[in-house]
């Protein structure tokens, strides 16, 4: 609707420029906003205020001329002027009910497919395979996945890239320990050790710190690994396979759409690193600094005003994250043919990605028109406001966090529904517990830090997963009571009551909200929308009897509105990665 109104206003502006009311250079970008007070219509624009000065007119006088020049449109019932010159648009009920019918009849709730779908590469999760996944991996994993699902729902081609940390000096230490354990304990004992990667890593680190001979062996294995030694590569692949299976188990439990096929880690770019450096050199971008190969760009300086280096090869010949990130950017542009690349990585890496994106385009690795965006996020903190840790100050493993979430949810659901059997309790607890952890994050602006609090996230009040899941079951219960499949609702939409009209107007904004999520990489916009829809349905349910309505036409209309609410909530929660329940 916003695009439709913008087109109408632009047509009116052209008319006023043609008749001399406005100067030829007076055209400005038109901004349309939704109104908060529905007595002022559904949409408003301040274009008359913006153009009053170049027109040499009072804003209200210009607004009157703009309204007179607007083409007729069936979507608009009325246009008026408010305050100093705001133009308010009232949406026609016939237009609104048409949108509702289209949404109800369509698998995509009336959201049209893009004429030119984009290929979007999304880099997210990307854990270090040397260790088990911990709470620090949660935000990238679930925020990235929500945006991926939204982009696909809108009709774009999405290529997931799980850029795992599967290379580097720490693997020498791990391979040395793996080799040692194979010799001393045999395959069965070794597999038991690898079942807990964190313990394995700590044991390897302890050996590295305490034994000079072990440390020497670890360093030698790094060199052999990086030179392509078959023995080392076999050990390395064995370790990575175990680590990746740990990651996949977490993804499956979280309901995240990443699969082994999406893994394209640091090691995938090893063969291209030397060429990246050579190509930077051939373009005259390289400089030597203390033996290292660097790129200096004028746009990036330190506090003293000196250029900051991007080091692509160390003095000892080794490569860095910057080198593999540049190789990844080139691969994603040239091989994956990305129109857009989104990186869901901690916002503390903002400078690194600014440098990478600038350099990739400067070097011609990525076309100028390709959108490169770092979707940074804040930290998940404990009650003390510091990064979330265990009681002894250690890193919280993600599997332990999810275990506790399900246990707490089980106790909560059992208390509310003691009559349920264990299997049903476990299924509900899984949906509520995992959903609560995810939604507590996804309902926050990704750029903000937030406090992790089990009591708040498992509450059935406020903007939480339990509240939203329950809201959906409440709508679904209407159709169980009516013994009606919501796919079989019929009749016309009749929006006679304010609560009906307000809910209907919000439901048809689903596509607009999803587009904002896709454009900005901000799933909290969808969370806020779903919470609002759930609240509006509650008000509608309270003020507009559905099954007890004596007028069959009104009853059918309200059932249709309930059906569209249910489908909107269900689709929305699924895009966030939640698992809606028919009963709770």
Swiss-Prot record:
Annotated InterPro entries: aa-tRNA-synth_I_CS, Arg-tRNA-ligase, Arg-tRNA-synth_N, Arg-tRNA-synth_N_sf, ArgRS_core, DALR_anticod-bd, Rossmann-like_a/b/a_fold, tRNAsynth_Ia_anticodon-bd
Compartments where located: Cytoplasm
Pfam annotation, one family: DALR_1
Chief place of localization: cytoplasm
Broad EC category: ligase
HAMAP family: Arg_tRNA_synth
Protein name (Swiss-Prot/TrEMBL): Arginine--tRNA ligase
Source organism per UniProt: Alcanivorax borkumensis (strain ATCC 700651 / DSM 11573 / NCIMB 13689 / SK2)
């Amino acid at each position: 609707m916003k695009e439709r109104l913008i087109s109408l206003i632009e047509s009116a502006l052209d008319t006023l420029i043609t008749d001399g009311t406005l100067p030829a250079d007076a055209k400005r970008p038109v901004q349309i906003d939704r109104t908060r007070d529905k007595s002022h219509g559904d949409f408003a624009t301040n274009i008359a205020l913006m153009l009053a000065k170049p027109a040499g007119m009072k804003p209200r006088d210009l607004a009157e001329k703009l309204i007179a020049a607007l083409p007729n449109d069936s979507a608009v019932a009325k246009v008026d002027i408010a305050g100093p010159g705001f133009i308010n648009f009232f949406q026609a009920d016939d237009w609104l009910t048409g949108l509702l019918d289209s949404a109800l009849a369509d698998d995509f709730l009336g959201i049209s497919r893009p004429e030119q779908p984009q290929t979007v590469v999304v880099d997210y999760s990307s854990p270090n395979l040397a260790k088990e996944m911990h709470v620090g991996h949660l935000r990238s994993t679930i925020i990235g996945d929500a945006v991926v699902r939204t982009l696909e729902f809108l009709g774009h081609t999405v290529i997931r890239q799980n850029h795992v940390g599967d290379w580097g000096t720490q693997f020498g230490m791990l391979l040395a320990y793996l080799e040692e354990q194979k010799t001393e304990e045999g395959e069965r004992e070794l597999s038991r050790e690898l079942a807990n990667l964190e313990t394995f890593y700590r044991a390897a680190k302890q050996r590295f710190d305490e034994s000079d001979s072990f440390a020497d062996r670890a360093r030698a294995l790094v060199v052999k690994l990086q030179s392509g030694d078959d023995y080392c590569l076999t050990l390395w692949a064995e370790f990575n396979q175990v680590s990746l299976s740990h990651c996949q188990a977490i993804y499956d439990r979280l309901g995240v759409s990443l699969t082994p096929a999406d893994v394209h880690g640091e090691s995938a770019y090893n063969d291209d690193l030397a060429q990246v450096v050579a190509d930077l050199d051939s373009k005259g971008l390289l400089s030597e600094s203390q033996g290292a190969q660097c790129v200096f760009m004028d746009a990036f300086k330190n506090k003293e005003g000196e250029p900051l280096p991007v080091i692509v090869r160390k003095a000892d010949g080794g490569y860095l994250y910057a080198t593999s990130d540049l190789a990844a950017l080139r691969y994603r542009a040239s091989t994956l043919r990305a129109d857009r690349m989104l990186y869901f990585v901690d916002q503390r890496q903002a400078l690194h990605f600014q440098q990478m994106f600038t350099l990739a385009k400067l070097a011609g690795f990525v076309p100028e028109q390709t959108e490169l965006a770092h979707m940074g996020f804040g930290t998940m903190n404990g009650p003390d406001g510091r990064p979330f840790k265990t009681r002894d100050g250690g890193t919280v493993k993600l599997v332990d966090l999810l275990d506790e979430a399900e246990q707490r949810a089980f106790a909560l659901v059992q208390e509310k529904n003691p009559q349920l059997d264990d299997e049903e309790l476990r299924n509900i607890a899984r949906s509520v517990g995992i959903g609560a952890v995810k939604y507590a994050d996804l309902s926050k602006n990704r750029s903000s830090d937030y406090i992790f609090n089990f009591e708040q996230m498992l509450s059935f009040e406020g903007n939480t997963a339990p509240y939203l899941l329950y809201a959906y079951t409440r709508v679904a219960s209407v159709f169980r009571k009516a013994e009606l499949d919501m796919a079989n609702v019929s009749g016309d939409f009749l929006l006679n009551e304010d609560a009906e009209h307000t809910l209907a107007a919000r439901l048809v904004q689903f596509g607009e909200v999803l587009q904002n999520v896709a454009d900005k990489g901000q799933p909290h916009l969808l969370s806020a929308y779903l919470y609002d829809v759930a609240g509006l349905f509650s008000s509608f349910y309270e003020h507009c009897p559905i099954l007890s309505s004596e007028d069959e036409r009104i009853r059918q209309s309200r059932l249709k509105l309930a059906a569209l609410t249910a489908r909107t909530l269900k689709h929305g929660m699924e895009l966030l990665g939640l698992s809606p329940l028919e009963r709770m």
